[in-house]
Amino acid sequence: MSVTRVILLGALFGGGLAVGAAQDAELKPPPEDTLYTLPPVVVTATQARERSTPVTFSNLTARNIRERYSVQDIPVLLSELPSMTTTSENGNGIGYNYINLRGFDQRRLSIMINGVPQNDPEDHNVYWIDFPDLLASTDNIQVQRGAGSAFYGPPAIGGSINLVTNPFSATPSIMVESVLGIQEYGDSLKGRPLATRKVAVTVNSGIVGQRYLMYGRLGRITSDGYRVNSSVDLSSYFLGAMRIDRSMITRVHFFGGPIHDGLAYYGIPKWMGSDPHLRRSNWSDLSADSLAVSYTSRARRIALGSDTTYAVPRREEEVETFSQPHAELIHEWRISPRVTLHNTLFYYAGDGSFTYDASWADSAMLRIGTSYGFPAEENPRNALVQAFVGNRQVGWLPRVEIDHGDGDLTLGAELRFHRSTHWGKIAYAENLPEDFDPGYHFYEYNGVRDIVSLYAHEIHRLADGWNVMASLQLAYNRYGIRDEKYLGTTFSVPYLFLNPRVGVNVNATESLSAYLSVAYTSREPRMRNLYAAEDSWFGATPQFAADTSGGTVRYDFGSPLARPEHLLDVELGGRFTGRDAGLTLCLFWMDFRDELVRNGQVDIFGQPVTGNAGRTRHYGIEAEGIVTLAEGFTLGGNATVSRNRLVRYTVYDDGGSPVVLDGNPIAGFPDLLANLRLTYRNAWLTGSLVWKYVGAFPTDNTDDPRFRNDACRVWN
């Protein structure tokens, strides 16, 4: 997609208006006070630093973000970092997008904004679409790989990502931004329409009353999407205020935006990808004999030919509307030169629904009948289901940092409480009973999630360039379901984990350093692994040990079938930093017990179905480097070579016979990834040529070459 951006800048000086470039400047409170700069929001215990912290990480700076961001979602911007891959539901990187890090999907990552957890407490997923245009207000992004030292949010299995927003400026300014994008479909039926539009207005107050700063940004992004009926309409806002006192800094952030998007969560068969028209297809459901189809000569026959069992096109009514405002209060108090107290309070409230095709559902599934108060003589036809979710989450993240001379000690805690309401109703159907109540909820339940953790983190400085890190986290969390309509399922499942981490960093010279870290991390399964209550109307049941004697099912809610994951992660790395070049190397060894792996199936919403594997292992090498080729020209890149294998994993076929998969590659994990970026930069212009390679990877665990995603290469 080609993008053109036009920016109008206005800097306000003494009530006049001059055209100029907005720039950051040092903030000078009253003359008798100390000189302040505008500090970013950094969670010190989780933010890694070169030559100090023994952690494998990469940073995207404010300049990187400004140069590369236009309209794309956060995962697309991050996709060039080491071991990172991105997928897009609607095909153009605007809408629902997902990140994989070292092959681990984003449910296994710990995602934070200003240190505040963003993973959904029940599903563990991250809905980047709920943060439209947030990158325009972001100052820094750090990605830690492996068992990242993120003490807030879910334990980091594959890694952690922290976005830091710091949009304030001491210089008053107004900026109006417009972006136009031309979509290349490769389909003669569509041509090259103007498919993406963005408009945004940014206001910085500068210094007000010698100690206050205010910031506001309003925007809107619209896109037709690449796939059929996959458009998005994303409004956004980010409002912030800061007060700086002699020993305190207080910030308030309020951000989010209502969204409206067409559903595109169901994928296409691999063999459709070679046809420029069919690969834009957006099906609600599809069944086909993909193994019998030639990828080229017969691809166009899928819509009409014998290779399709059935295909249900996505209906225009299948859309989502959602809004999740985020409110944060971030306070820093420097009690003494050696002691600083940090407190973060936050509140999220998300409400919305999506409407999807349920033409396959009968009266029994939709709970229509005499026993439900609606006598039905025939099944509904062409049903559309509206699924609603309402979330409320409040949290407090306190921590104290102590400089005790030989090191820095951080003590902190996390308290989060999440409550949710879920229900479904029939948005439309033919042949409904005459007295049918359109507000009738055929499923409904409330979710509960409580999270409490304590941690201690020490970076101890030894003699001559040696730093030792030791961390310990005690994490308690509890899942629960209450007030389930019709089935009456109620349970509460607690988890308690102790997550230690140790490491050492040594600075051999001014240019060369090395590190070693060892971490043990445990993580609970997500709610759907225990009970997909929103799917109970078409057959989902609680996944707990059950007693079926006497013909009645009695669940033991103290014995969930899905087990927590346990990871031992060892990272050995080195960094070289020169005047014109830099290089980082990392060897990693990740040994799992009970890893939740994909089994090759997807649910009705296109999401992978997972289950525990007894023992798995991931190991490999990562390299990241940059070199200045000539004045203005730089070449940067990274590569990952890894091996991801099932060590002990047995499944059972339909007849109940065991199938041993020991030694097979793990679904969803490519063994080879690479990125290159050639950049030219001067005072007025920045341009880049980008190449990305993603190696082939299996889509299930059988090691059958027919079930693989082919390797791909992309130039931008």
For each of these PLM feature ranges, what is it?
Residues 24-67, 106, 586:
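Short, acidic, small-residue-rich periplasmic hinge/interaction motif at the N-terminus
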Residues 132-177:
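A beta-strand signature from Gram-negative outer-membrane beta-barrel systems
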